């Protein structure tokens, strides 16, 4: 019956000329249900009459059969807290782990940190640099003890050629002539397969004579190249050089024209330093008796040194058709240079480089 009476009164609200409803009357018809455990609900009660008084809400609710029933109570929902502190799979915006996948660093309780990841390009570059350093060191170790290649056996030459080919394939400076900061400077010869240097290398293997150093100085500002050689003996050291000019023919090739040779005055040693034994054609020769008679000879050597010191170097022009040559740089970095000329292969290290430390 309550349902029927409510249905009969409902059209009065939507009649053509309804009676105005005051705010106080409307407010009295709205109440908050105290039985909802989670959210308040709004209930509207039909007007009882023209006076606008609201009916007292009943605590019982009638169903469609007219029987009273208690209002249903919604079960309370429990929320499971995350197992980790702070949570790994969600942030304050409700986003999951996909937003920061791969960048979360579990540091326990506290503020999470984000680890910096190296780019693939940087890792690849580091790998290439390490590979080149390993190849350079292997090449230097292979040529060590070969007297600049003069005493290198066939298997050693083959191994050197393999290392050189790998370095040339990974050359970090494809246009060395256009890189003066790398090309300029003094370069010390480590190994050569040049037939033109064989007589000089052979002289360094003579008894009481040692080939100390062969070097090449390049100056791209003046377009000059100077090849220098130093020999030493128990009595003195000798230095001579050959100067040349060059023209750039390509980013890797220069054309060299030799001008003149220069012989420096010998540097006489204050004390004669003879070994006790020398090897001559496979025979050991003792120099003991000679060492005992060197006392008076040292005074003569000291006088000669004072006479020739301060003398100007001897200049020797280089005539003939063989005054021109070409040189291609096939590998260049801050401390190693590989060049090929019409006379063969040259492996050089920059003066002061750690590659010269053996």
From Swiss-Prot:
This is Plastoglobulin-1, chloroplastic. The gene is PG1. May form together with other plastoglobulins a coat on the surface of the lipoprotein particle. The coat may contain receptors for attachment to the thylakoid membrane as well as regulatory proteins that may function in the transfer of lipids to and from the thylakoid membranes. The keyword Chloroplast applies. Belongs to the PAP/fibrillin family. It is found in: Plastid, Chloroplast. Residues 48-114 are annotated as: Disordered. InterPro entries: PAP, PAP/fibrillin_dom. GO terms for cellular component: chloroplast. Residues 1-47 form a transit peptide. Keywords: Chloroplast, Plastid, Transit peptide.
């Amino acid at each position: 019956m309550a349902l029927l009476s409510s249905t009969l009164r409902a059209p009065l609200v939507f009649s053509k000329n309804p009676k105005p409803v005051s705010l106080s009357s409307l407010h009295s018809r709205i109440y908050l249900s105290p039985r909802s455990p989670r959210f308040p609900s709004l209930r509207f009660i039909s007007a009882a009459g023209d006076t606008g008084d609201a009916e007292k809400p009943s605590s019982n609710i009638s169903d469609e059969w007219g029987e009273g029933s208690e209002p249903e109570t919604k079960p309370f929902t429990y929320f499971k807290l995350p197992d980790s502190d702070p949570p790994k799979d969600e942030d304050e915006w409700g986003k999951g782990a996909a937003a920061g996948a791969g960048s979360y660093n579990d540091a326990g309780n506290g503020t999470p940190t984000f680890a910096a990841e190296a780019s693939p390009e940087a890792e690849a570059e580091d790998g290439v640099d390490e590979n080149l350093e390993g190849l350079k060191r292997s090449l230097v170790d292979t040529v060590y003890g070969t007297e600049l290649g003069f005493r290198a056996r066939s298997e050693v030459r083959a191994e050197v050629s393999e290392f050189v080919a790998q370095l040339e394939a990974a050359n970090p400076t494809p246009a060395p002539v256009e890189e003066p900061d790398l090309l300029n400077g003094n370069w010390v010869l480590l190994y050569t397969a040049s037939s033109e240097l064989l007589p000089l290398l052979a002289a360094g293997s003579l008894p009481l004579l040692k080939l100390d150093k062969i070097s090449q100085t390049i100056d791209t500002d003046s377009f000059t190249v100077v090849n220098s050689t130093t020999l030493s003996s128990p009595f003195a050291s000798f230095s001579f050089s050959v100067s040349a000019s060059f023209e750039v023919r390509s980013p890797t090739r220069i054309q060299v024209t030799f001008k003149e040779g220069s012989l420096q005055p010998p540097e006489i040693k204050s004390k004669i330093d003879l070994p006790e034994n020398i090897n001559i054609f496979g025979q050991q020769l003792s120099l003991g008796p000679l060492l005992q008679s060197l006392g008076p000879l040292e005074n003569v050597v000291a006088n000669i040194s004072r006479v020739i010191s301060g003398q100007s170097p001897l200049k020797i022009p280089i005539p003939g058709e063989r005054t021109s040559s070409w040189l291609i740089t096939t590998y260049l970095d801050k401390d190693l240079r590989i060049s090929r000329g019409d006379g063969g292969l040259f492996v050089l290290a920059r003066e002061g480089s750690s590659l010269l430390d053996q």
